[in-house]
Curated annotation (Swiss-Prot):
It comes from the Bacteria. Belongs to the ParB family. The gene is parB. One of its GO terms (biological process) is chromosome segregation. This is Probable chromosome-partitioning protein ParB. Induction: In infected human monocytes transcripts are present by day 1 post-infection and last for the 7 days of the experiment. In patients with confirmed synovial Chlamydia infections, 6/8 had transcripts. In infected human Hep-2 cells, transcripts are visible from 11-48 hours post-infection. The keyword DNA-binding applies. Keywords: Chromosome partition, DNA-binding. SUPFAM superfamilies: ParB/Sulfiredoxin. It holds the Pfam family HTH_ParB. InterPro entries: Chromosome_partition/occlusion, Cro/C1-type_HTH, HTH_ParB/Spo0J, ParB/RepB/Spo0J, ParB/Sulfiredoxin_dom, ParB/Sulfiredoxin_sf.
Length: 281
């Protein structure tokens, strides 16, 4: 066992004693990428050990929770390693460990766009940070954070296709450039069914807007749809969850889509702590 300059500890642990953080935003690990990493580890060794913290019950260590390096840990498992060197962080409270996990993942380039958006969302909802504070913590512009959060206003099918890599961030930006929700749905379906390139999607978006004189800013009959689209996008960006805003007779129905009790509690907290000014600005 040796000491690092930061006073964190370098040690060898059983690979089966390591667990994934519940705050890990990354959900997609491509097998081909892991195989390439396995080859690299076998060739040059493990240059950067995973970073963990201890989860204890009194004096007993129950397991080690990953703060950084899940991809490396998975590659080591695939390579058949039984033990693995890790950097053991000194005692971290749950909130500090969760924040460190999210920030470490954001600062890496291998998250897909929706995983990045999810990491930003958790920092905002779970830790009560503003978009400005999130941007400063992760070294990005506020506009970058806001643009990623806008992805939650995309149709659910588009989000699924983004997770699978069938639709890129470039495609998403083209879809979001349309103000009308119906046109977004039409363009999304066209991108998916025809496998349009980003440039082709841009041309199709222009055609849709011009096709029926449908520029929402010029067509007064489309103003209600434009207003609902604005509200939907603003709510999704502010709270970081997929949301729909649809007319039902004389009423407007706002629906949030969350998975599990933890997400529901986080949304409830966000709804009770967010001011109207934060939503509308």
């Amino acid at each position: 066992m040796s000491r690092l300059p930061s006073e964190d500890t370098l040690l060898e642990v059983n690979i089966e004693d390591i667990r994934v953080s519940p705050f890990q935003p990354r959900r997609t690990f491509l097998e081909e990428d892991l195989k390439e990493l396995v080859l690299s580890i076998k060739t040059v060794g493990l240059i950067h050990p995973p970073v963990v913290r201890e989860i204890r019950n009194g004096d007993k260590v129950l397991y080690y929770e990953l703060i950084a390096g899940e991809r490396r840990w998975r590659a080591l498992q695939l390579a058949g390693y039984k033990t693995v060197p890790v950097v053991l962080k000194q005692v971290l409270a749950d909130d500090m460990a969760a924040e460190a996990t999210l920030i470490e993942n954001i600062q890496r380039v291998n998250l897909n766009p929706l995983e990045m958006a999810e990491a930003f969302r958790r920092l905002i909802v779970v830790f009560g940070l503003t978009q400005d504070k999130v941007a400063k913590k992760v070294g990005k512009k506020r506009s970058t954070v806001a643009n990623y959060l806008r992805l939650f206003s995309l149709p659910q099918e588009v989000q699924e296709k983004m997770n699978s890599g069938e639709i890129s961030l470039g495609h998403a930006k083209v879809i979001l450039s349309l103000e009308d929700e119906n046109l977004r749905q039409i363009l999304s379906q066209k991108i998916i069914s025809c496998k349009l390139a980003v440039r082709e999607a841009e041309m199709e978006a222009k055609r849709l807007v011009k096709g029926k004189g449908a520029s929402l800013k010029e067509d007064s009959s489309s103003q209600p749809s434009s207003r609902l689209g604005f509200c939907q996008e603003r709510l999704a960006t502010t709270f970081g969850y997929p949301v729909t805003v649809k007319p039902q007779g004389r009423r407007i129905c706002v629906s949030f889509f969350v998975e599990g009790e933890e997400a529901l509690e986080a949304l409830e907290k966000a709804l009770t702590t967010s001011s109207s000014e934060a939503i509308l600005t």
